[in-house]
Amino acid sequence: MKEARRVTQEFKDFHKGAITIGASYVPATYLLPEVVHQFQCEFPNIKITLLVKTAPEIRMMLQNHEIDLGIISAAPLDEPLLKQTNIMPDTLVLAFSKEHHFSKKDNVSLQNIEKERILLHRNPSTTRDLLTQWTLAHNITFQSEIELDSLETMKQILKYGNGIAFISKLAIEQEIQRNELCYIPIPEFEFQRNIYTIHHEDRWNSKIISFLLQSITSFTTKN
């Protein structure tokens, strides 16, 4: 009933109201700023709330009707109540400082990686889930781990040459351009991760949501 009332109000006046977006870190940081700017120009009277959470948290919030739209980096998912659209790949890579000895190696093996200090995302996160699947598939046990809640902190630690990290390539593009970090493909990593827009199946696709989705699609196409 609450959802129906909100839909009715949006239909009456799509130039007023509010929209709540949940986004995981990578799309929130590297995709949404320009999209939100375009949205505010088109709908200046719409209040936007952006919540940065992990992908599992965003899925739960959508199921509970706590947010209108989710934008997440995730592996392909199959949840009947949630409708998803794949908008772009979000490739995980193995990142390290240009001073790290991996930057001088022609080939990095699984055994080489196993001996390094690994910077890990906290649970729950899609990155951590995929990394766990990869380590189990190849019987890898890290000898030294540092668990972090912040991707920015992880990147700063990497710059000092202190360890390696499995990280989104999108998240380190600026550091790569500035020659602060290097990366290689993760050896024998066969898992797929993309950025998806995701919404509850009973959430009406209003003019506001439609414009937002078009802005996201336009951004990913030109980039």
Report residues per predicted region.
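A late-sequence structural motif
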Residues: 31, 182-223
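Central regulatory/effector-binding core of bacterial HTH transcription factors
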Residues: 16-78, 148
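Short helix-loop hinge/linker segments at domain boundaries
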Residues: 1-20, 29, 37-45, 79-85, ...
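Secondary-structure junction motif
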Residues: 102-103, 117-138, 205-213, 223
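Hydrophobic hinge/microswitch elements
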Residues: 54-67, 73, 126-183
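Ligand-binding cleft/hinge of the Venus flytrap
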Residues: 35-44, 111, 128-141
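Acidic, Gly/Pro-rich loop/turn segments at junctions of secondary structure
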Residues: 42, 53-116, 190
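Short loop->beta-strand "edge-of-pocket" segments that line small-molecule binding or catalytic clefts
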Residues: 22, 92, 108-127, 220
